[in-house]
Swiss-Prot record:
InterPro entries: PRC_barrel-like_sf, PRC_RimM, RimM, RimM_N, RimM_N_sf, Transl_B-barrel_sf. This is Ribosome maturation factor RimM. Pfam families: PRC_RimM, RimM. Keywords: Chaperone, Cytoplasm, Ribosome biogenesis, rRNA processing. The gene is rimM. The keyword Cytoplasm applies. An accessory protein needed during the final step in the assembly of 30S ribosomal subunit, possibly for assembly of the head region. Essential for efficient processing of 16S rRNA. May be needed both before and after RbfA during the maturation of 16S rRNA. It has affinity for free ribosomal 30S subunits but not for 70S ribosomes. It is found in: Cytoplasm. Binds ribosomal protein uS19. NCBIfam families: 16S_RimM (TIGR02273).
Length: 166
C-alpha cells in the first residue's frame, strides 16, 4: 500500500522550484534533502531527488535535482507523490483514500458516497455527495459516524436532525 504524501500545486520562481501541498504528517521525513520521491501524473511516473526544501505559505517549496528551470517545473503541475507507510503510521485511524468512495448509509438506506475528506484544526469533515447530487459536510466524529467498514465499503452515519439539509 502506498500513501499520497503531497501534490505539486504550481511552479515557483524561475529556477525550477515547485510548491507542494503536503498531505503527510511527517513532512520533515518525507521531504528531506536527498530523498527520492515517486510521483505520478497523467499515467507517467517520475522519480525525483530533492535538492532543497523550504517552507512557504503552508506549503513546501522544493527544488529537484532533475528540474532545471520554470518550464520543466511547470510540467510537474498536478504530480502526486506517493510513499510506503512508515512503521509508526499504523494506528486506529483511516487514510483519506480509504474513506473516499465509501457508501454512506443512514438507517438501512444508501444516501450517498464519501467524495473527500477535509482536515480541520478541531476535527475532520467527510465530504459526502448525496444520491441527489447535493454535497454535504459531515463531522467525522464517533457520535455521527459510529461505524466505518472498509471491507464492506460502507460508512454508517447517525446525523442530528437537519444536518443533511444544510
Amino acid at each position: 500500500m502506498e500513501l499520497m504524501i503531497g501534490r505539486v500545486v504550481k511552479s515557483h520562481g524561475i529556477r525550477g522550484e515547485v510548491a507542494i501541498e503536503v498531505t503527510t504528517e511527517e513532512p520533515e521525513i518525507r521531504f528531506a534533502q536527498g530523498e527520492v520521491l515517486n510521483g505520478r501524473q497523467g499515467g507517467k511516473e517520475h522519480s525525483l531527488t530533492i535538492a532543497s526544501v523550504r517552507p512557504h505559505q503552508n506549503r513546501l517549496l522544493v527544488k529537484f535535482k532533475e528540474i532545471a528551470d520554470r518550464t520543466a517545473a511547470d510540467s510537474l503541475r498536478g504530480t502526486r507523490f506517493f510513499a510506503a507507510p512508515l512503521d509508526d503510521d499504523v494506528d486506529d485511524g483511516f487514510y483519506d483514500h480509504e474513506l473516499e468512495g465509501l457508501a454512506v448509509i443512514h438507517g438501512e438506506e444508501k444516501i450517498g458516497e464519501v467524495s473527500g475528506v477535509i482536515h480541520g484544526p478541531a476535527q475532520s469533515l467527510l465530504e459526502v455527495t448525496l444520491e441527489s447530487g447535493k454535497e454535504v459536510l459531515i463531522p467525522f466524529v464517533h457520535d455521527i459516524v459510529p461505524e466505518v467498514d472498509l471491507d464492506a465499503g460502507t460508512c454508517v452515519i447517525t446525523p442530528p436532525e437537519g444536518l443533511l439539509e444544510l
